[in-house]
Amino acid sequence: MTDIINKLQAFADANPQSIAVRHTTDELTYQQLMDESSKLAHRLQGSKKPMILFGHMSPYMIVGMIGAIKAGCGYVPVDTSIPEDRIKMIINKVQPEFVFNTTDESFESLEGEVFTIEDIKTSQDPVIFDSQIKDNDTVYTIFTSGSTGEPKGVQIEYASLVQFTEWMLELNKSGNEQQWLNQAPFSFDLSVMAIYPCLASGGTLNLVDKNMINKPKLLNEMLTSIPINIWVSTPSFMEMCLLLPTLNEEQYGSLNEFFFCGEILPHRAAKALVSRFPSATIYNTYGPTEATVAVTSIQITQEILDQYPTLPVGVERPGARLSTTDEGELVIEGQSVSLGYLKNDQKTAEVFNFDDGIRTYHTGDKAKFENGQWFIQGRIDFQIKLNGYRMELEEIETQLRQSEFVKEAIVVPVYKNDKVIHLIGAIVPTTEVTDNAEMTKNIKNDLKSRLPEYMIPRKFEWMEQLPLTSNGKIDRKKIAEVING
């Protein structure tokens, strides 16, 4: 495996003025990125605890990542937009020696020695630093939601990141020195899919500002000014952008490669994208945070769209061996699997196994292997029981999306005394709803040919678009709040 830091340094030596990272009006060259990260690494040297990387979209967040990797301590990205109580939970769990605060604000909850951007800019530390990271070191820890309300810190090994990056570069058909688009916040592991493959291939990492997440017109302005080649995002963010009629190959001929991860890619959205960008390479990928971003991929073509009404997630990559339990739960084994949850042995033991030096992870996803392809069939914990019938909400959503009247759909269970009493469908219709009763009848008639009566939502709520979280995923919690009043 080729060391990422060595690749970055070699490219910086050969192309010092090439732009490495860009965010709105701020940018850093490769030489600046490597120099500034070396100055930070000198300050972190010898630390045995991960550095807290605090902030939001900015070039200096990348400086923080590379600096922490060089120092060998790794980093924990913490987004400023999350609640203060959650920040405190993460800080208490990590107990950091060092914090790199890339914002202009000060936060009482930050513990340890705090560095700012200005500290690094004005530092007299040397701009040369020999990377200390080892293959078995933890390179980053990303906190995800926990069922108990306490976030879980997923620890990823450096060798796993290097292997993932090499796989991404093998998939990449656009070549080196490309303009990459990253939509995801740094606290969401989808960002890893853009950051390291981009920089390891001498590309420019273009960061989508957080204000653009629910405003496709602002993104349109960005795409007009920068010839983006490679787009990395969630399917939901891309679907929102497809509301722009100008998002097509004729207007943006430089856009020739798409990578999607983080959620299921709806057939209708993929069909629209293939139609608008017929010459582009489009990848659907799948993977949990606990297995280094993504473990499968498939190139979406018209042939694949014609063959599969529900899209597969493809075949496994190096470092990931997939299988299912008797209950249909997907299990991942190999180098891609996380080292477990930071300081949480109980939760780690529940889903990870490290026997005989082989790492395995039970995903909680239902899956099947058919015709040489893997298919994700929803979450085990998205199962509900209604009138004695056990059912998958995502199965109902998939069938709703097959209807000619439905563009997007989420199914929300309605509870009374902790019991599901009926279902409501949150629907983005394909046309304006002028007659509520007629549209409801049409959709229910469509469902009756594919689902038993007990799985059909009692009623539907019409929405212009489904709200997204800051990560660019569909915000199920917000939809439920809107529906339940």
UniProtKB/Swiss-Prot annotation:
Its EC number is 6.2.1.54. Pfam families: AMP-binding, AMP-binding_C. Keywords: ATP-binding, Cytoplasm, Ligase, Nucleotide-binding. It comes from the Bacteria. GO terms for cellular component: cytoplasm. It is an enzyme of class 6 (ligase). GO terms for molecular function: ATP binding; D-alanine [D-alanyl carrier protein] ligase activity. One of its GO terms (biological process) is lipoteichoic acid biosynthetic process. Pathway: Cell wall biogenesis; lipoteichoic acid biosynthesis. SUPFAM superfamilies: Acetyl-CoA synthetase-like. Coiled coil: none annotated. ATP binds at residues 144-145, 284-289, 365, 473. The keyword Cytoplasm applies. Catalyzes the first step in the D-alanylation of lipoteichoic acid (LTA), the activation of D-alanine and its transfer onto the D-alanyl carrier protein (Dcp) DltC. In an ATP-dependent two-step reaction, forms a high energy D-alanyl-AMP intermediate, followed by transfer of the D-alanyl residue as a thiol ester to the phosphopantheinyl prosthetic group of the Dcp. D-alanylation of LTA plays an important role in modulating the properties of the cell wall in Gram-positive bacteria, influencing the net charge of the cell wall. Belongs to the ATP-dependent AMP-binding enzyme family. DltA subfamily. This is D-alanine--D-alanyl carrier protein ligase. It comes from Staphylococcus aureus (strain bovine RF122 / ET3-1). The gene is dltA.
